[in-house]
Amino acid sequence: MDKNSRYTVDSSILFRQWLNDTREMVQDTIFHSRIQKKNNNHLVSQRVFFEQNAHSHYFSYRNNKNLFKENPVSYIRHQSLYNVLKNLKKGRYNPDISIDLHGLTQHQAQQALGELITTCQKEKIFCAHIMHGHGKHILKKQTPFWLSQHPDIIAFHEAPKFFGSDAAIIVIIEINSLKKNINIFN
């Protein structure tokens, strides 16, 4: 036996002798915080899911009569907000958030747009950038139609060249705190 192994054998024997008269403690404390957090997270995620579905519900109307044939695509909810659209066309609004719909199905794209609107309203972001791409022109044709159906969309216009030109849209979203004072965009 070498010197190091003798110390480990002796020390383990001493340790066992030292703990010989001890007994195991019974854990009698019950922790509920973990379960409550789990339930709260579940309720929060469920509420967010319902909010996103509520926003994507507006996109479910299918009767589009090719409303957006003109190029570039633009929309304004009400003529009194024409200055917003004019500033949007001039590129005076820089989007704070962006979403890419490339490779998504129509249903997934609707869900993603609902998530975008929910996020923008929670974070108080009024300008968003939506990349729909070229592809087979399915999302390119449907996205403006879906956005025009949503009551919280103030205006949108084809993105400037820097943001993707005709493969993207810049959107102005109404935020609840700005509903009273819509002239902030002027």
Curated annotation (Swiss-Prot):
Disulfide bonds: none
Alphabetically ordered keywords of this record: Endonuclease, Hydrolase, Nuclease, RNA-binding, rRNA-binding
Smr domain sequence ranges: 99-174
UniProt xrefs under SUPFAM superfamilies: SMR domain-like
GO terms (BP aspect): rescue of stalled ribosome
Ranges annotated as spanning the membrane: none
Xref: Gene3D superfamilies: 3.30.1370.110
Keyword rRNA-binding among record annotations: yes
EC number: 3.1.-.-
Pfam families given in the database record: Smr (PF01713)
The UniProt record lists the keyword RNA-binding: yes
Domain of life where this protein originates: Bacteria
Gene Ontology molecular function, alphabetical: RNA endonuclease activity; rRNA binding
PANTHER family assigned: DNA ENDONUCLEASE SMRA-RELATED, UPF0115 PROTEIN YFCN
UniProt family annotation: Belongs to the SmrB family.
Subunit composition and interactions: Associates with collided ribosomes, but not with correctly translating polysomes.
Cited function: Acts as a ribosome collision sensor. Detects stalled/collided disomes (pairs of ribosomes where the leading ribosome is stalled and a second ribosome has collided with it) and endonucleolytically cleaves mRNA at the 5' boundary of the stalled ribosome. Stalled/collided disomes form a new interface (primarily via the 30S subunits) that binds SmrB. Cleaved mRNA becomes available for tmRNA ligation, leading to ribosomal subunit dissociation and rescue of stalled ribosomes.
The protein's name in its UniProt record: Ribosome rescue factor SmrB
Organism name: Buchnera aphidicola subsp. Acyrthosiphon pisum (strain Tuc7)
Gene that encodes it: smrB
